[in-house]
C-alpha cells in the first residue's frame, strides 16, 4: 500500500495541471452528492490488494454529503480548486499537490469551488465502510467557502 500511495503522490505532483487520466463516468453514487461529479475507479481492491484508489472530479459547487470512513481516507488533489471540511476544524483549501489526511470516522465533506472544478485521487484501505450522512446545504457550503478567505 505504501508503494501505491507513493506512486499516486508522485503522479499527482507531476501531472497537477494536465490529468493523464480520463475523468470517468457520471458518479454512480450521485445520490450522496450535490451537483455533478465524475468517478474513475483505478483499483477497487480486487485480487487481494488492500487499497481502493479512485479519481473523483467535482464540477463547481458540487460536493459530497457529510460522511465518515471507518478507516479514514487520503485525498491527493490533482487539479482545480476546492475545499475539504472536517467537522470541528478549519476548512482546508484543496489545490494541486495538497495531500489531505482524513482520520478514521471523522465527519467531513469535499467539494469543488464556487466557480472552479476540483479533481482528487481518493485512497482508502479496504474494507472501509463509508457512512453517508446529511446533505451539505447551500448555506453551509457558502459558510465553509468563507472560511477560506
Positions of the model-derived regions?
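Ligand-binding loop in jelly-roll beta-barrel domains
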Residues: 83, 104-130
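Structural recognition of the beta-strand scaffold that forms the well-ordered cores
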Residues: 66, 74-76, 101, 120-122
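Short acidic-glycine-tyrosine-enriched beta hairpin
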Residues: 88-105
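Glycine- and acidic-residue-biased ligand/ion/polar-headgroup-sensing regions
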Residues: 70-82, 87-88
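A short, N-terminal "cap"/entry segment at the start of jelly-roll beta-barrel domains
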Residues: 4-6, 10, 15-50, 130-149
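Histidine-centered catalytic micro-motifs
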Residues: 64-71, 106-112
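Conserved short histidine dyad/triad with adjacent acidic residue
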Residues: 52-69
